[in-house]
């Protein structure tokens, strides 16, 4: 008989055997994350609005683990749930489907309003599971470009400053204004997602945030974040106002200089989100710099709707041709 339960420290040895096929770096990092999660139980005891750490559930059949799924609430908006890991045994499509449906039902009952998964476009079986098996829809794509041998045409660095919590409303407004209209209902963010949470030191990644202002009006015209999970591989993410001519060379120069202040040997990547108004121009720039796109992920979204309980035995009164319930 199969059952789904929270991951515990007693499950780790079985999980380690299950993920032996992963690359050495991925296996070590994955094991470290699961070990930390299994030892911190407080996150599982609090309501959804206070959750901030990953939670992993396993599907087991007697003593055999058939699959696992990890979810992470969005920082500042825990009602948006991100599915970050889904592993199941080969030819166990139904196990993956059970885990996803379990997460949607469990967190939906707690108040979650949307679920997101970013799936590599080469994983056909996983895409089929989410799209056809679990009712997700594909919104757009996110690409990752490697900044290897990046040679800027301009040596200057943009004059970013550290982002403060007081900047959050303006940054959220900037991000949302740059979304293509088609994707706004699913991809919009609230200001709390751009505030530094009090538990920042407990999450399994490190992020620096910066903003660029118009020197005349002090209006925020660009937002930059630098994220790493291992202090070796850094991902740069940029949001810019398409009404301003902002030099990507200067933005990247600044980002690389910030990373090099802390690390001498590192790998840098930049995210390209295809659902923004600046996506085409940014992609053209990346090609002109002879950079390589090393990964494309499909952004999959599922909105959770609670069924509305309908009133029974409603009396209808007809008055002057109008129906009043």
Language-model features: locations:
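Internal, hydrophobic cores of structured domains that mediate oligomerization or house catalytic pockets
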Residues: 106-107, 113-151
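Conserved acetyl-CoA binding element of GNAT-fold acetyltransferases
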Residues: 78-90, 231-245
């Amino acid at each position: 008989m199969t059952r789904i339960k929270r991951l515990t420290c007693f499950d780790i040895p079985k999980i380690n055997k299950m993920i032996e096929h992963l690359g050495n770096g991925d296996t070590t990092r994955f094991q470290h994350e699961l070990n930390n999660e299994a030892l911190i139980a407080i996150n599982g005891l609090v309501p959804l609005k206070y959750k901030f750490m990953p939670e992993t559930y396993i599907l087991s059949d007697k003593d055999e683990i058939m699959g696992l799924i990890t979810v992470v609430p969005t920082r500042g908006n825990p009602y948006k749930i991100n599915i970050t890991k889904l592993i199941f045994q080969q030819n166990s499509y139904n196990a993956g489907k059970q885990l996803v449906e379990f997460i949607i039902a469990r967190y939906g009952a707690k108040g979650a309003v949307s679920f997101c998964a970013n799936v590599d476009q080469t994983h056909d079986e996983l895409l089929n599971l989410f799209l056809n098996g679990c009712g997700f829809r594909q919104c757009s794509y996110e690409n990752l470009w490697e900044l290897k041998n990046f040679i800027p045409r301009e040596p200057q660095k943009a004059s970013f400053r550290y982002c403060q919590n007081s900047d959050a409303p303006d940054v959220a407004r900037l991000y949302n204004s740059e979304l293509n209209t088609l994707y706004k209902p699913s991809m919009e963010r609230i200001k709390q997602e751009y505030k530094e949470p009090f538990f920042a030191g407990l999450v399994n990644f490190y992020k620096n945030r910066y903003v660029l202002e118009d020197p005349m009006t002090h209006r925020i015209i660009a937002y930059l974040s630098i994220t790493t999970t291992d202090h070796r591989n850094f991902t740069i993410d940029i949001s810019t106002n398409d009404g301003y001519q902002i030099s990507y060379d200067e933005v990247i120069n600044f980002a690389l200089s910030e990373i090099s202040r802390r690390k001498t040997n590192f790998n840098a990547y930049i995210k390209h989100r295809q659902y923004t108004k600046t996506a085409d121009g940014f992609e053209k720039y990346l090609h002109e710099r002879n950079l390589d796109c090393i990964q494309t992920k499909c952004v999959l979204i599922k909105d959770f709707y609670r069924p509305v309980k309908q009133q029974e035995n409603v009396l209808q009164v007809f008055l002057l041709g109008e129906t009043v319930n």
